[in-house]
Amino acid sequence: MGLEDERKMLTGSGDPKEEEEEELVDPLTTVREHCEQLEKCVKARERLELCDNRVSSRSQTEEDCTEELFDFLHARDHCVAHKLFKNLK
């Protein structure tokens, strides 16, 4: 077994036509991006960004943005849960 054979095993057949396959798109990513544009998610993201800016501007603080992060993720994932399974086969 030579070096060329090993390359073919690692990368496929070595045929450039096979390597130009259509790139698959994860439906979860697409639905998340759509849901992040909805009003409830936009407001939650704004609260998260305000908190992040507030915490980042201070050198000494006990505050973190865990609650705001979870609120944003909950709002986004709630939207995703209702839309994602319609896109799956």
Curated annotation (Swiss-Prot):
Keyword Repeat: no
Any matching Pfam family: UCR_hinge
MF terms in GO: ubiquinol-cytochrome-c reductase activity
Localization (cell): Mitochondrion inner membrane
GO biological process per UniProt: cellular respiration; mitochondrial electron transport, ubiquinol to cytochrome c
N6-acetyllysine PTM sites in chain numbering: K40, K83
Residue range covered by the transit peptide: 1-13
Disulfide bonds: C35-C79, C51-C65
Residue segments, region Disordered: 1-27
Principal place of residence: mitochondrion
Family matches, as Gene3D superfamilies: Ubiquinol-cytochrome C reductase hinge domain (1.10.287.20)
One cellular component (GO) term of this entry: mitochondrion
Membrane topology: Peripheral membrane protein
Subunit structure: Component of the ubiquinol-cytochrome c oxidoreductase (cytochrome b-c1 complex, complex III, CIII), a multisubunit enzyme composed of 11 subunits. The complex is composed of 3 respiratory subunits cytochrome b, cytochrome c1 and Rieske protein UQCRFS1, 2 core protein subunits UQCRC1/QCR1 and UQCRC2/QCR2, and 6 low-molecular weight protein subunits UQCRH/QCR6, UQCRB/QCR7, UQCRQ/QCR8, UQCR10/QCR9, UQCR11/QCR10 and subunit 9, the cleavage product of Rieske protein UQCRFS1.
Protein family according to the UniProt entry: Belongs to the UQCRH/QCR6 family.
Function description: Component of the ubiquinol-cytochrome c oxidoreductase, a multisubunit transmembrane complex that is part of the mitochondrial electron transport chain which drives oxidative phosphorylation.
Protein's name according to its UniProt entry: Cytochrome b-c1 complex subunit 6, mitochondrial
Organism: Mus musculus
